[in-house]
């Protein structure tokens, strides 16, 4: 999953849940 937030190493609650789940 290529997301700017993940690329920056900063995980948001919504982003992390959407990606992992």
Swiss-Prot record:
Post-translation changes: Glycosylated.
Keyword Lipoprotein in record: no
The keyword NAD is assigned to this record: no
Tissue expression remark: Expressed by the venom gland.
Keywords, alphabetical: Disulfide bond, Glycoprotein, Growth factor, Lipid-binding, Metalloenzyme inhibitor, Metalloprotease inhibitor, Protease inhibitor, Secreted, Toxin
Subcellular location: Secreted
Subunit structure: Homodimer; non-covalently linked.
Name by which UniProt lists this protein: Venom nerve growth factor Bco12
